[in-house]
């Protein structure tokens, strides 16, 4: 900043010298040569200073109040455009400064000044054009096509697109002139300046766009817009979009690559970017016309500035009002049923608990049949009497057996060797079928007849239907408790999250990226952090006990807490991990302070967020999300919808006995990434359940994007610049 101010002071000193040299008695040739030398010297000083800033920012004299960093947020860009144009207009108001510019090709010099803002316009445009489902305009078109409440929105959006295109078409030429400022001729620039203010003027387009944001009622007496203090921007296009998003069905909302909050903010950004483009072209054109001797345009310039300032403030207030009432949480739709692939789109715990058929005679050490099936609520398999079903299917000899019950005495069991299953289906003598009956005699299955029997007259040796909890090579039941941390010391933050299974262990994997100012992220730095592998015991050493850096699920401890963790204002998410709390898996999130204007993360002051409530908590205890007779999650033909709230928990359980012979563990775990596009700071992370009645559903991550409404304030200091009226007065 010091070097920039120093350079500008030297430039001003040069200009004062210029006024001395421009005496009437001097030769015009001598004056022109001297002016060229002085201006070139000053320009070299300024260019050197700008180059030292690595083109990340440019600043005008501190007295003008114009400071530009990487202006990726629309409000900052608008303020900067207003300050830059005011400063340049004030300088040009000096007659001899104007004469100097005229002598040196002043139109191109003014064009170069405006070109200094090109990268900042381009940066915001690039962000608005990013996303896997197209840029902001394409996403807004999707709302028109897919939302069930889009009639009003479609009409307004179509009108806005036409107006935006009018401004963009002209700005494309303006941008082309800036890129070729050294060769563009005076006639071309003069035609451009006159075009901006003729016919369907930019001024009218900007006014129409703003009226769509802030509709108002004309005063019947003088047909003037009401006083600025009385304007309340209700019922505008931002509110219309909010209504369309609120009423849209879940399958549409989850298809977006950003939160509803982010989408409305991006519409606001698009409209304010368009306003800034138009205002810059209007001011540029008046400056040129003034140079070309077409008039002073002081009144027009000042009126345009006042209108632009009013529109800027009103748009920001309208956006802030809408954004404060919109959710900034984002979740993803199910992968289409036909595209589901295990360990790519979803993950499941395998054989955590599994339906298991066993005869009572094998459930006690004495091989007796004196009890009923229900007596064996927590037992073990003691043997394999008579080499019957137990000899023809995988046993549960090293595990625990729970919740036995009697169904019928005799059945046909389709035993299978498919991964993750013991049985395909069971058909009882009565004709009752559990599971989906298919051809059984094949390379992967065989039909085994089971008949209960009487031992003497008094005891019935019944086949029981139980649950088997048996660790082993077929049972993936492990969850990493290691922290997944972004490199916050290198100014990285979490930008996305997903579940990954590696070496039979479920991990949290984070996407990280470099934080940039004002909520943005350097897309070139995005990467998924490598998984730190965990080795779990195998063979005889494998148990259902927790180990170093991991938790093992088992019948007694198989619950997952469902929470939304929100960082304090001024913090972003920089890490995630699971912990064990009261036998439950419980999510923790690391939040680190961040400076909004600079994007600088203070990694030394990071904190861990968690929800310590348990089902036994006296106030606000956790409640259970129950799954009633659930089928396999991927069999649902209807997309899942969220059905849990924070402060709940869910237990991993077997699928329905009737639908699936209790062979799978549900809910499944969603493996698809949850990351906004374009990337933005994340201020919250949650785990929730989504599903449909009668199915296991999925546990999945959701994320909260930055609430921009917290930062949409315009202070009086930001309007602290000198106008032309001040200069002339």
Which residues make up each language-model segment?
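Lectin-type carbohydrate-recognition ectodomains
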Residues: 24-729
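A positional/structural detector of protein chain ends, strongest at the extreme C-terminus
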Residues: 1-5, 726-729
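Cleavable N-terminal signal peptides of Sec/SRP-targeted secreted and luminal proteins
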Residues: 3, 8-27
């Amino acid at each position: 900043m010091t070097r920039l101010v120093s350079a500008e002071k030297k430039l001003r000193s040069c200009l004062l010298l210029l006024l001395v040299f421009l005496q009437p008695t001097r030769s015009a040739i001598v004056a022109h040569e001297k002016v060229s030398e002085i201006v070139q010297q000053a320009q070299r000083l300024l260019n050197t200073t700008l180059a030292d800033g690595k083109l990340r920012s440019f600043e005008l004299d501190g007295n003008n109040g114009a400071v530009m960093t990487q202006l990726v947020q629309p409000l900052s860009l608008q303020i900067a455009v207003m300050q830059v144009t005011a400063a340049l207009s004030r300088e040009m108001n000096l007659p001899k400064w104007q004469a100097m510019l005229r002598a040196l090709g002043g139109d191109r010099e003014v064009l170069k000044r405006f070109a200094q803002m090109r990268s900042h316009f381009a940066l915001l445009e690039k962000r608005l054009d990013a996303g896997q489902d197209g840029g902001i305009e394409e996403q807004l078109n999707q709302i028109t096509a897919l939302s069930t409440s889009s009639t009003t929105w479609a009409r307004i959006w179509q009108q806005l697109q036409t107006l935006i295109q009018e401004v963009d078409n002209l700005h494309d030429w303006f941008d082309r002139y800036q890129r070729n400022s050294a060769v563009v001729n005076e006639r071309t620039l003069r035609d451009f300046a006159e075009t901006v203010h003729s016919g369907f003027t930019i001024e009218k387009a900007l006014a129409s766009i703003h009226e769509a944001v802030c509709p108002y009622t004309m005063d019947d007496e003088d047909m003037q817009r009401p006083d600025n203090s009385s304007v309340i921007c209700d019922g505008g296009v931002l509110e219309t979009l909010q209504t369309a998003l609120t009423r849209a069905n879940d399958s549409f909302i989850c298809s977006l690559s950003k939160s509803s909050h982010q989408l409305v903010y991006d519409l606001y950004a698009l409209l304010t970017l368009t306003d800034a483009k138009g205002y810059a072209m209007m001011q540029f054109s008046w400056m040129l016309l003034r140079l070309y001797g077409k008039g002073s345009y002081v009144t027009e310039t000042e009126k345009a500035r006042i209108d632009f300032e009013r529109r800027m403030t009103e748009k920001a207030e309208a956006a802030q009002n809408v954004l404060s009432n919109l959710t900034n949480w984002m979740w993803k739709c199910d992968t289409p049923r036909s595209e589901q692939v295990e360990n790519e789109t979803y993950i499941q715990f395998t054989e955590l608990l599994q339906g298991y058929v066993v005869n009572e005679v094998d459930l006690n050490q004495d091989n007796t049949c004196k009890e009923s099936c229900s007596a064996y609520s927590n037992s073990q398999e003691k043997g394999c009497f008579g080499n019957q079903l137990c000899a023809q299917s995988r046993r549960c000899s090293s595990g625990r057996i729970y919740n036995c019950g009697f169904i019928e005495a005799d059945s046909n069991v389709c035993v299978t060797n498919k991964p993750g299953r013991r049985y395909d289906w069971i058909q009882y003598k009565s004709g009752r079928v559990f599971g989906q009956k298919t051809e059984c005699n094949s390379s992967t299955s065989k039909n085994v007849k089971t008949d209960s029997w009487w031992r003497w007259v008094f005891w019935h040796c019944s086949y029981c239907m139980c649950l088997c909890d048996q660790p082993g090579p077929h049972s993936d039941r492990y969850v990493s408790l290691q922290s997944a941390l972004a490199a916050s010391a290198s100014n990285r933050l979490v930008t996305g999250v997903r579940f990954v299974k590696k070496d039979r262990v479920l991990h949290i994997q984070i996407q990280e990226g470099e934080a940039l100012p004002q909520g943005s992220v350097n897309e070139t730095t995005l990467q998924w952090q490598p998984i730190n592998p965990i080795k779990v015991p195998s063979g005889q050493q494998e148990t259902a006990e927790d180990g170093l850096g991991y938790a093992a699920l088992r019948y007694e401890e198989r619950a997952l807490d469902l929470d939304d963790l929100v960082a304090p204002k001024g913090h972003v998410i920089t890490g995630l991990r699971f912990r064990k709390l009261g036998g439950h898996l419980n999510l923790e999130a690391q939040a680190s302070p961040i400076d909004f204007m600079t994007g600088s993360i203070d990694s030394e002051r990071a904190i861990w967020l968690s929800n310590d409530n348990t089902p036994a908590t006296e106030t606000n205890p956790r409640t259970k999300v129950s799954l009633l007779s659930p089928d396999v999650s991927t069999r649902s033909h209807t997309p899942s919808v969220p059905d849990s709230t924070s402060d709940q928990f869910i237990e991993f359980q077997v699928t329905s006995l009737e639908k699936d012979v209790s062979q799978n563990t549900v809910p499944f775990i969603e493996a698809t990434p949850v990351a906004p596009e374009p990337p933005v700071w994340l201020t919250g992370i949650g785990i929730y359940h989504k599903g449909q009645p009668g199915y296991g559903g999925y546990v999945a991550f959701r994320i909260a994007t930055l609430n921009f409404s917290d930062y949409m304030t315009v202070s009086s200091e930001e309007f602290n610049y000198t106008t032309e009226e001040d200069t002339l007065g």
